Amino acid sequence: MSVISMKQLLEAGVHFGHQTRRWNPKMAPYIFTERNGIYIIDLQKTVKKIDEAYNFIREVSEQGKDILFVGTKKQAQEAIAEESVRAGMHFVNNRWLGGMLTNFNTIKTRIAKLNGLKKMEEDGTFDVLPKKEVIILRNEEEKLVKNLGGIVNMTQSNIGALFVVDPRKEKNAISEAKILGIPVVAIVDTNCDPDEVDYVIPGNDDAIRAVRLITSKIADAIIEGRQGEQLAE
């Protein structure tokens, strides 16, 4: 029994690919047909690939490993944040800072700075500082939250997989994962290179509903895996 139905995928518009002139020939095996200058993705293959990705993510989660969600394009930002939080995971949805995985010690100093600013706000330090200084500190905090808010509790060594929306846009995240041997699961549209991804989910990465639907399935897999881990304890 599949974790997702063709009907759900159709309703969310997962089958709509890019214009035929903007395609990667390596995606040919996942294309069903062409309609009005747009490639239509073969949803039977998408169902199969979602099942494979779901099982893999569930296993990673069962082992107690974490999954990092990455999606910085506008259509993905909300789903990436909300679904990763629902699954108790980490996310990057604003900007991938170089070294987020490969130079995590430097990133950790920025996270410590963010935590320090939060503490200053909570313990009333901001109330006794000059107004100008507080404005500067608040702006810095806001910027840090945008870029690092989703990974404040992340331990780099415990990341077991990356879930990515649009591997073309998130190529830096994928190359860092590759260096560290971290498997990548991704929503791959008709203009992307599937060879960059370990678990390809062929689908529309530009429609909010399509991204939300697939991202929610990844979150479900994590939750199911964690429950299995709890049952095993």
From Swiss-Prot:
Keyword Ribonucleoprotein: yes
InterPro entries: Ribosomal_uS2, Ribosomal_uS2_bac/mit/plastid, Ribosomal_uS2_CS, Ribosomal_uS2_flav_dom_sf
GO cellular component: cytosolic small ribosomal subunit
GO molecular function: structural constituent of ribosome
GO biological process: translation
Superkingdom, taxonomy of origin: Bacteria
Pfam families referenced in this protein's UniProt entry, alphabetically: Ribosomal_S2 (PF00318)
TM stretches of this protein: none
Keywords, comma-separated and alphabetical: Ribonucleoprotein, Ribosomal protein
Family to which the UniProt record says this protein belongs: Belongs to the universal ribosomal protein uS2 family.
Protein name: Small ribosomal subunit protein uS2
Natural source organism: Clostridium acetobutylicum (strain ATCC 824 / DSM 792 / JCM 1419 / IAM 19013 / LMG 5710 / NBRC 13948 / NRRL B-527 / VKM B-1787 / 2291 / W)
